[in-house]
């Protein structure tokens, strides 16, 4: 789908919303405790109106356009110093979200060191089962035997304390047809899941995709055989036509799914948080257009505007994240053609920044050598966005020119913040290039190369610390 086609679509969506009020709450079959419109202006600071819903074409049910991604719950320590999910925080966020119309919750057996499903299930089970939809996955990455896959599938029912899963996904397919067949076809799991769908224990069957355009098109050919109920893709205004690495541009994926009438679930609307932490110059431009709105809200409006989008997932760790997204989607104000044109230019600009395309999913973790891989990338990207490009001035002169002074400030800021943000035992210089992490990265980042690049930058800055 070309940008001009999206502009036409967004313009039409905005016009229809204005004429009919479809951007507000919907009346029938909404899983929000029976309320037509969930939430209003009040303690969460929403501007007014209820949550925007999309209609699931299979059962005609209403799904909140804001979906809760359960991969980023707040962590704490137990009495033995082990990382565990802060259950009290999860309960509070789930209660708040449900009360304000969010009814789609997405998890996986591998999220948060395998703790996400149980913590999410405990929080949700305190509410009526018909007030929310559960989405989870068959995440059989390392052991795709039928025995292990069946155990993982059965465990999800136990973790969520339920007799049915509303949305079930084959997790992160797209590396190769061989990988897809090994994980799901040859072991008989896909045939089994199709029967589970017929029996009603799975209500919607789909998959999440990470891969290139060729693989996307190949897998989509299976729709005639398997009749996918939905497909989850990475979509945001940066990846619409500027996807990195092996990933397919979102405009192509969305366009092909829309043609076939397959509902789309959106992941990474903020691109791992990077679209909430933009270069200062771009932040100024966004604030000039809409001073009262958050930087993140632009990305969420982009992801939610297309009408074939069923829900947009957001991993909301803290209450302020949830409240900001509720303001954006209660109700959603679709992008205008002018908005889309502007974000297209922002994306063009962002594609020129030397960022590492890490989304912070942590699939690469833990590193056997203790490196905080996402932390190293996040710090580097943050410094680039804030203008600390730490490019050494041309020439060998030690003269204190303005350019040299700027370099000294940037160098010091980078080094000080690096040591504060990343423990020394977790820094990039510990990478030996074993490559264990690479096969797990859905963005296909050459992780050792990027870590070595960051380490080289750090060492270069430290070597020059006595010169200036």
Positions of predicted regions on the chain:
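Twin-arginine (Tat) signal peptide motif
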Residues: 1-7, 364, 431-437
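Active-site groove signature of glycoside hydrolases
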Residues: 160-179
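N-terminal binding-site loop/beta-alpha segment at the start of enzyme catalytic domains
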Residues: 2-132, 192, 198
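Short, acidic/polar
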Residues: 83-97, 145-159, 213-220, 296-299
């Amino acid at each position: 789908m070309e940008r001009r086609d999206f502009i036409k679509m967004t313009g039409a969506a905005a016009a229809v919303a204005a004429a009919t009020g479809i951007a507000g709450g919907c009346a029938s079959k909404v899983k929000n405790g029976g309320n037509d419109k969930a939430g209003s202006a009040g303690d969460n600071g929403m501007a007014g109106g209820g949550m925007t819903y999309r209609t699931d074409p299979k059962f005609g049910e209403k799904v909140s356009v804001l979906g809760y991604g359960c991969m980023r719950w707040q962590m704490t320590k137990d009495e033995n110093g082990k990382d565990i999910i802060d259950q009290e925080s999860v309960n509070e966020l789930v209660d708040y979200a449900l009360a304000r119309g969010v009814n789609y919750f997405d998890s996986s057996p591998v999220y948060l060191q395998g703790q996400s499903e149980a913590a999410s299930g405990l929080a949700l089970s305190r509410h009526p089962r018909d007030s929310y939809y559960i989405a989870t996955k068959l995440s059989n990455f390392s052991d795709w035997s039928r025995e292990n896959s069946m155990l993982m599938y059965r465990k999800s029912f136990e973790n969520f304390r339920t007799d049915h899963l509303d949305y079930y996904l084959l997790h992160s397919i797209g590396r190769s047809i061989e990988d897809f067949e090994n994980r799901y076809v040859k072991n008989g799991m896909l045939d089994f899941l199709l029967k589970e769908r017929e029996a009603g224990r799975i209500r919607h069957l789909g998959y999440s995709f990470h891969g290139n355009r060729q693989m996307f098109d190949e897998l989509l050919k299976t729709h005639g055989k398997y009749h996918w109920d939905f497909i989850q893709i990475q979509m945001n205004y940066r990846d619409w036509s500027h996807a990195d690495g092996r990933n397919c541009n979102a405009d192509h994926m969305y366009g092909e799914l829309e043609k076939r009438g397959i509902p789309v679930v959106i992941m990474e609307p903020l691109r791992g948080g990077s679209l909430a932490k933009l270069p200062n110059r771009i932040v100024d431009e966004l604030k000039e257009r809409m001073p009262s709105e958050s930087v993140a809200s632009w990305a969420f409006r982009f992801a939610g505007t297309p009408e074939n989008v069923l829900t947009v997932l957001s991993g909301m760790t803290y209450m302020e994240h949830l409240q900001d997204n509720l303001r954006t989607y209660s109700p959603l104000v679709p992008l205008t053609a002018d908005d889309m044109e502007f974000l297209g230019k922002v994306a063009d600009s962002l594609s020129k920044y030397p960022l590492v395309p890490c989304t912070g999913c942590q699939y690469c973790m833990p590193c056997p050598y203790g490196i905080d891989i996402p932390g190293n990338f996040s710090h580097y990207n943050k410094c680039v966005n804030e203008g600390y490009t730490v490019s050494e001035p041309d020439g060998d002169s030690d003269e204190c020119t303005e350019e040299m002074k700027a370099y000294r400030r940037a160098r010091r800021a980078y080094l000080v913040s690096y040591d504060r943000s990343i423990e020394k035992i977790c820094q990039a210089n510990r990478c030996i290039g074993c490559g264990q992490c690479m096969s797990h990265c859905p963005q296909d980042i050459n992780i050792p190369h990027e870590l070595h690049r960051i380490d080289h930058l750090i060492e270069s800055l430290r070597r020059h610390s006595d010169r200036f």
